[in-house]
Regions:
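A conserved hydrophobic position in a structured secondary element of the catalytic/binding core
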Residues: 206
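Positively charged n-region of N-terminal signal peptides that target proteins for export
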Residues: 1-4
Length: 244
């Protein structure tokens, strides 16, 4: 079954668009995974200067979804005919993604140009219910959670791995575009479990030290993006993006 899945992903990869990155993008996080069915990835932080793209940190290890990768919905749309991200499939979305805000239960030092940060409270929700009009969106209750549904959607408060996280804008609301129900929700960069000994449910996880360094480096005015692909696909496409 995994062999069939791998073939479908590889065939779809040849249809994946390698269009130029946005002109105002000068920061990129590159995730180079061991393969479509691997939960292991190497992350690198790249910045564009007068002489082109240079690596400012990495590569360093991180973990992906337990079942590996699948095409996601971001700046790039999934290739036609390829397997796509679904809610609960334990796969991390592959492609090119914008970044959202930082959320956490711990303080984050703020600089002049920082990613927006919100301190999580018991009223902060992130909806993973495909039947909800607020699917894959953050909202704040006007009261403390009461119903089982509200408790289920509550952002994690007492979980070290989720004490600091950065939203990856997979299947995210944008202008009039709403998230596609069931196409995957709550995809973040966050702290890994068991010092990297455990995969995720679809997020990208790393050490707290590396996560904090990455968040401190990011500058929203530089339109940072996350590119996540199997290593062989990244090597095939990086030239079109001018990346090392």
């Amino acid at each position: 079954m995994k062999a069939v899945y791998l073939c479908l992903c590889m065939l779809a990869a040849f249809c994946f668009s390698a269009a130029a990155l946005p002109a105002d993008c000068s920061q990129v996080i590159v995730g180079s995974a061991d393969g479509w069915n691997s939960s292991h990835v190497q992350l690198s932080l790249l910045e564009k200067g007068p002489r082109g793209w240079v690596m400012v940190k990495g590569p360093f290890p991180a973990r992906l979804g337990k079942s590996g990768l699948v095409w996601g919905r971001g700046v790039s749309m999934p290739p036609s005919g390829g397997p796509v991200k679904k809610e609960g499939d334990l796969r991390s979305p592959a492609g090119i993604f914008e970044l959202g805000g930082v959320y956490g239960t711990v303080p984050v030092p703020q600089k002049k140009r920082s990613m927006p940060y919100r301190r999580i409270t018991p009223r902060d929700m992130w909806v993973d219910d495909p039947a909800s009009p607020l699917y894959n969106q953050h909202f704040v209750l006007k009261h403390d959670p009461v119903t089982p549904w509200e408790f289920k959607q509550q952002m994690k408060l007492n979980d070290y791995a989720h004490s600091l996280k950065l939203f990856i804008r997979h299947n995210a609301a944008s202008g009039r575009e709403k998230p596609v129900p069931g196409a995957g929700s709550s995809i973040f960069f966050h702290i890994w479990r068991r010092d990297g000994g455990a995969p995720t449910a679809g997020c990208t996880a790393m050490s707290e030290e590396n996560l904090r360094a990455m968040i401190a480096w990011l500058d929203p005015s530089q339109h940072p993006l996350y590119i996540l692909l199997p290593a062989m696909e990244y090597l095939r496409l990086r030239g079109a993006w001018g990346l090392p």
